[in-house]
């Protein structure tokens, strides 16, 4: 059985900016001392004795606690989750240890260029988030009283959502009773913060030892996509970057321009972003971005073959059938929409959504993203800023609607 327990308790819900990283530290303390176990080690030993697994993660908006276990001990593991989440005994010794661990984790991210790009891109477009360096500086400010305050305010019954996947036959009533017994204050379901997004000039994060260009760019629309629209954009991403025969990645690989790049849709509560990222040699960058411009221009003009769409739909159908082979896969599918933007789309509706994909929707959405005028390019490299500016020029398109006319 796989269980995910989520609270809107991420970094954006910190009481004040000076303790921004507090949610991350709370997450690290999640499986520490509690009402029954005196230490993290004691809890861990009992939790994992039959092979069960647990983890936790933090984002701008969420803190999520996960577990997976053998079917025969699902109720024991759920009870241990209850103890960990509802009765933590925060202490200064574990706090100091986890503050050090969080700092080490974030410092390590400073050497992963893709980890530098996305927070910078968020900032560029108007999201109220700090950089990695700024996040690290907030860690020393976090005290035990801050941890307790954040936990009490955010870990409440109304602010909790859950996904449970596994053999639920004849167990739903018992699961409901167990969850209703959790001793959490009623609290409230927090609203997702809203940021007014805007266009941005390109940004270069200079690293003198980075001979390649690691890049990320996005177009954003200020609304949430519907499930059919998400599937249409997933189809387009597959056509552009999904395989070695795709229009952008496939051609780029064939011509020796790039080893790897990808594109994706990020559909959140208030907006949706069409994201691309990858790494390219400096001498190949302009040719790669010329190719990106060419292929997106073709999409905006409606130059998509029916057979390409059918091939992408066939691929998606296969991935659908492969995507429910484990309880974790099923749980992840629902978490992606339910926790992120409140969407609860039944998995067995997927074939119908795939069948409904059509060229008109794909072209309309691509045009909407491009003409939204909310766009940004972030790079990490040792190259001159002038080259980055040239790459950004290749991500500009005039009159997308007219191109598709």
Could you say what each language-model-derived stretch is?
Residues 21-34, 252:
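Active-site SXXK
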Residues 29-41, 45:
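Metal-associated gating/positioning segment near the N- to mid-region
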Residues 2, 22, 26, 62-64:
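A common structural microfeature
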Residues 41-189, 194-196, 223-224, 232, ...:
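Charge-rich, well-structured scaffold segments of protease-associated domains
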Residues 10-15, 36, 62-63, 67-70:
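Active-site-adjacent loops and short helices of periplasmic peptidoglycan-processing enzymes
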Residues 16, 20, 162:
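Active-site alpha-helix of zinc metalloproteases
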Residues 1-7, 13, 159, 187-247, ...:
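His/Glu-based metal-binding/catalytic segments typifying zinc-dependent metallopeptidases
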